[in-house]
Amino acid sequence: MTLQFDDLRQRGDRCLNFAAYSPRRLVLIHTAVSLGASLVVGLLNLLFSQMIANTGGLGGLTTRSMLETAQAVLELAVTLALPFWNISLSRAALCWARGELAEPPTLLEGFRRFRSVLGVKLLTGFIFLGLCMAVSYIGSMLFLFTPFAGGLIEAMDPIMQNSGVLDPELLLSDEVMAQISSAAVPLMIFLAVLFAALAIPVWYRIRFADFAVMDGGRAAVSLLESFRITKKKAWEVFKIDLRFWWFYLLQLLTVVLCYGDTILAALGVQLPISPDVSYVLFYAAGIVAQGLLLWWYQARVSVTYALAYETLTADETVLNAQ
């Protein structure tokens, strides 16, 4: 069966309308925890940075170390916990798509399936890490045979000794490193394009691994299931993404808003307020904007993809039965 966006959206709206527990309320709880944790971490980082800056001298070395350790541990804890919290929304979306009850305890499903979710995340990371390493090595070799490699070869030539080993003295020269960095831009572009050309198709083949693991599958099985159901269907999933272009664009703009103070500073724009106040205002504004966006639209987007997963899974079941 072909994935028809309009049909998925209409079915999704019906699923949300008949949900026993308000999907927007559930998304609000999910978003409040996610963004609230990010906001708290951001504010605590600012506080810790100020405390570290105000602690000088050898006498404050122990205090600075403790503050830096607390800052690192806090960031690590939130970074590790959020993926398990965020993936739980996929379980809620599956419940909406199937007419099942999704309520606040559903948002803990990612933690209940800790091992499987962790396995999916690690395997996904290994897939793209391996792909990145392969592209870096093979792509660099291929780049040397292109006409764009001439500038980089010329920039590297002065620092190569007769034995083909880099001269460490010249490597310390700022002028030489600036020339190499400038000449390496075509290589970076080439590798980025090559990586995107390989990674995007792979990403769309494992796009539904989160739904599969929330549907009860184990880590490797969930990835294989996603590969199986998206066979010859990745383009249709991509077209669904294109129909949600406005949602992803608004998400990007909210992220840009969070770093508005940094962007304005890079553009040379100075605000008539202190940098710390500017950081807090922009970061809080971005968090609020993102929260409103997710509260209003996240349920409709999530249930659309959940219904796409259900459709693809049903199609594979029919094919296997035949």
Residue ranges and their predicted role:
Residues 2, 64-101, 132-151, 179-219, ...:
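Selective recognition of hydrophobic, aromatic-rich stretches within alpha-helical transmembrane segments
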Residues 1-14, 162-175, 313-322:
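Low-complexity, intrinsically disordered extramembrane tails and loops of integral membrane proteins
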Residues 2-37, 104-134, 181-192, 200-253, ...:
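Interfacial aromatic "cap" segments that immediately flank transmembrane helices
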Residues 47-52, 262-268:
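Juxtamembrane "helix-exit" motif on the non-cytosolic side of transmembrane helices
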Residues 59, 108-109, 272, 320:
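Compositionally biased amphipathic helical and low-complexity segments enriched in hydrophobic
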